[in-house]
């Protein structure tokens, strides 16, 4: 494996002056060539990519699958906007929508930066496609869309609790996969997903109990 090193920078003598010295340029990053090959000057982005830990198939599967998983949560919130007047649910839905959309953008960027396929947001909803853990089936989504008022509130909370539980299963599967989550970005992201989903499951479980009294 070729090493990436910083080339030494020779600086001219510095003379005292009333004028401030110009900003120093960062040292160029070079990659020594093999015998007979020339040395290459690398961009900062390429050098960082070469030093980045390897990406495993489990990493890619997790990010691709979680995009579809998050997209369904956004779809569920869209239904909530017109089917209930419960203010607490609307506030919950707003938080879920903002976080899920932001995380979808993050996952898409992660995949693009590593040259991986970025699936469409509803790739997991297609007929015959295998759903990620916790995702609602087409029949369950149709039942949720047809529900109103109190019935909708109950189905939304139970469905979203199930949905979040599936995300936890996906994180656990990732961490249990050999060679996975060595990339610092995906490790931090998956850890945040786990913490956030657990917190929201606890919140929604409390909301469901209050509405069943």
Q: Which stretches of residues belong to each language-model region?
A:
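All-alpha RGS (Regulator of G-protein Signaling) helical domain and cognate RGS-like helical scaffolds
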Residues: 20-213
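C-terminal motif of bacterial Sec signal peptides marking the signal peptidase cleavage site
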Residues: 14-17
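Bacterial N-terminal signal peptides that target proteins for export
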Residues: 1-6
